[in-house]
Amino acid sequence: MPSEVPESLVQALAQILHEHGDKVLDGSRILALLTPCLQVVTRLFEQLFPRGPGTGFQALPAHPADSVPILRAQFMLDMLQKTPSLKLVHPAECPRQFDVNIFPFKSLRSLELRCLPPHCLRGLRSVYSQLEVLTCYRCVSSLEEVIALCGGDLSSALPWLVLHTLDFSYNTLKNLDGSLELLNSLKILDLSHNQITECGSYLKVLSELQYLNLGYNHLTAVPELSVGNTAKLHSLILKHNQLSGTSGLENLPNLQHLDLSYNLLLEHSQLSGLARLHNLKQLFLEGNPLYFQKDYRALTAQHLSHKASDNVLLDGKLLSSSEIMNAQAFGEKVRLQPSSSATESSCTGDLTDSYSAAEKSAPRLPRKKSRVKVRTASISERSDSEYERRGQPIVLQHQREIERTDSFREQYGEDWLQYRPHLEGELDPEYVNRPHSPPPRASPSPTAPSSVPKQKSPVPAPEPSPSPKSGHVAPDDQLMEKAEEGLEEHLWGLQEAKKPNEEEGLIGGALCSPVVVCPVLNGQPRNPDWPWVFLRITLHFLLEMDPERGRILLKRELRSLRGIQTSLAPWKCNGEEQELPLLTLSFDSVCEEKQTVNYIVLDNSPESSVTTLLDLLRPMLERNLREKAESQDELTRMQCLKCKAEFRNEVDGGDIYSPESLQQGKEPTAGLHRNHTGDASCPSCGSLHIILAPLNPTGETSTPLRPLSAEPPQGDDGGGGLAAKSFYLSEDEDSSETDSSPNTAPSEAESTIFYSFDTEGQDQQSAQDTGRSSLTGSYKYTALNQSGALSQDGWQISPGPASTLDFRLVDHRLKLYLDMEVLNGDMEEFRCCMKVPVIRFGKVSEFWAVVAVSNQKIYFLEITGEIRDNPSDWLQPIESQSLTSLARLHVGLQEHSLHLGFGGSGGAYTLLTRNQQHCRVFHKHMLDVLAELPARYLGNIQQSSEEPITPQHRLWPFLQDKVGAPESNAPPRFLYVPLFFLREDIVSPNADSPCANANSQLPLLNTASPAALIQGAAAAAPLSLLVTRTHMYLLEEDHQWLPDTLDTELPDSVQMKEKQPISNISSVHLFQSATLHLRIHLYNETQQNESAWLLWTEDPDRTREIVEWLREPWEAEYHIHFNPVTHNT
């Protein structure tokens, strides 16, 4: 540094202190300085102190009072000496060897260092004893260099007396050290985002610790804590580590917040350490393997303390009462062991020699027979105990009754009453003192490949009672023990009854006979007490089964199989040592102990058994390796978040932080002190916001849906997970399946069946199937995963099958386009939008549009192409109207449309939703937006929530359809549904001439939703169905609506296309897999011809509603039940 201090820098710092000095001194603001700036200031003070800075509060030596620089320096010195909080940032361009002295800060309470190496800091020794908060980011590699050596001061280790918060997150710490012994008052410790693999016993010295954050490290076990800090610790964060168990958490009785998300917790049995956390309020387990299990929340609830389960937030959501009550149905209840000194042993008869392998490895607690409490024999006379009981005051007996009732209610919840009468009846002393024999055990298998001596379980000697007065067991204790035993027997029975049902499906699908093997670990049997098991292979799993009970001991997924090796290993069998086949299987698993499994084959013909296993496992291995190679190739593809373009990353844009880099020993914090200069960008738009492209679904997932205009591929059997089926539907209820693929068809819960009507192949199908009725048609069904239902390139614009009916939610790409290209007003904010067919007054046809509403305007953007890529490519803004010019807002007939009228020459629009729920929700959103306008504009808007039916209404002539009925001004009952219609005529051999098909007279283009198009509405015409008491009408409407002529209908606005009496209906067909489709068969007895109305609605509820409307008049006509035909496909 030059000897002359930069005057401008000093003036700028003095100006900042003048303006914000009061907030800096009271602690509401933190003084943040770059290290070069602080170095300039300290050198200025060193020049003004010829003898060097002192220890206490100081003033500058005598100087001319009229010198402005001196007065400015004195002011800065006074401010810095009183500053309580300081933040030092070391720029990346500055050298690493850069001394920074903090001697001017005499009153420092909080210090934060960013990217400043500790050895460059001077003066920490003079303030360490008064520091309360110390924070170091991206600069520390060991605790000792800061806490024990005080950075560059290299002082001797002295205690930090008042330091209560230490934040060393985002550093390169690999282990802890003994310097933590100097932090006697520490309450908050944050060591997250480091590389710590183990904590050892260094945290035991922190007796005042209340908050501990060790997230984003490499811990494999819960850190050890002392008795002092376990009593005070209330928050423990261990997320993003490698924990495989919760052992050690049981010693934290006051813990309230526990975060174990994104670890390696595989089974719920590993949560046993949570049972003693009676004060737990928040628990996070998201991202663990057990998180993805079925009934995850209920299974987790059974491992929580019953005192805390009612108030626990599991993954941010409160446990419901049903989840807590149903937890008992998924396994035995995890209970705390009694803390008394009495030793638990079995004293009720003969002991069994050993236990089976199933009992040892099954995740359940020992049954009651193995945990009967040792009681000293009572030698008191029965009359004595009765005399003592009779001599007790009535108040004392009543108090004990209340305590016993409270204990029942606390332990068993709402169901405690069902246990009490039964258990109190068993409290007879003769029944209590009667010896109980253990329940019968299943006999072991009569044959075994090797004789293994069974070891008897040691019986601990019962300890003497702690007090001679405790010889008599109180009735309350007997009642509680009987309640526990009864509850355990009940839960065990539920578990035993449920397991065979769950395992039956897996065992039933075995591909080979059981093979007797011995699981080997480190050259020895994995379970010495019962070394051999049955090995079975199914289509998806490798099963280890208990040979005694036939239960599944271990289940491994074969899709994670990565390697197979066979060899010979010496093995001692029946006292003779011989070489037996050794089968080694490698699996892809996050747990190291599950990556490799070894089996010694002990069958009578081991070579033949190994050959059978290899024949089954090798094809699975080849499939797994092939899929892994394909997925690795997909990992090289990148995707742009802005334009969604996919490309291959051929430019080295710098290191990518990934779990693989950690396993290879890469430093994720390398380059913390330098700027990132990677040049990886999107080749299409140049954006730097790129991610790894999502992998293409394989295996059992469905392939994307082909475009509607494309022809189905010839000879394609639907490989790759596509389950395509062709069905022939006759007038019968059941349809015959002509082609199926049961192995590749997804389950009903995983896929949705979409329906489409094949109009092009209709003539060919009729020519080929001359024996079938011409009334039937050809249909194609396609199974498709729900996530890829719409052919919109992943866009979700409400309303849609995969989105909610909250029109305020919008795809982020469309939201960005609206904010940048459409909304241009001052303080204009987006409110809601809907994709809907729009009809503008004066236009002939309807068109698809996105209607976007802000707090100032309504925008109409026409959809001109396929929804994909940049919104500007398929959206064309056509008009915008101010909300203040809105004059009328009316809901259409029976809530199927919404009419907007604007004052002046603004025109009118009809939003033809054809869905009551969509219209109702969007109308509510519109009212919420209009409520934000000033009151003077709201008074000018005419609103109506339903369209009135008067004699001037356009549909009134069709409603008075009963011949001879008197004219009435009261609107009759009717059903009105805008839908899509397709007519199918059937030629009868008795008819004089065939009926003309109406398809040629109807337009082939419509605005049906993608869901309706997939179900066959591509060739249907947009009409309106009107159902009265006697007839059905198909009406063609132009939906033109002019606000100024609300009560005067436009001429020729409604034309009747077809009219049919309800009595002509012969059958009605519904389809479970095509809920928008309805098929009505008609038969005209006068003309002796048959026809069919094929209808598609935009609301699945409307099809059932149409059927119910037709039921009453049809049954009144024929006096028989009206039963629609429902097709399962």
Curated annotation (Swiss-Prot):
Pfam families: LIP1, LRR_4, PH_S11IP. Residues 337-355 have a biased composition (Polar residues). Keywords: Cytoplasm, Leucine-rich repeat, Repeat. The keyword Cytoplasm applies. Residues 448-458 have a biased composition (Low complexity). Its main location: cytoplasm. Residues 365-374 have a biased composition (Basic residues). It is found in: Cytoplasm. GO terms for cellular component: cytoplasm. Residues 381-391 have a biased composition (Basic and acidic residues). InterPro entries: Leu-rich_rpt (IPR001611), Leu-rich_rpt_4 (IPR025875), Leu-rich_rpt_typical-subtyp (IPR003591), LIP1_N (IPR031782), LRR_dom_sf (IPR032675). LRR repeats lie at residues 107-128, 130-150, 162-183, 185-206, 208-229, 232-253, 254-275, 279-300. The keyword GTP-binding does not apply. It comes from the Eukaryota. Residues 436-447 have a biased composition (Pro residues). Residues 335-392, 428-475, 654-678, 696-724 are annotated as: Disordered. Belongs to the STK11IP family. This is Serine/threonine-protein kinase 11-interacting protein.
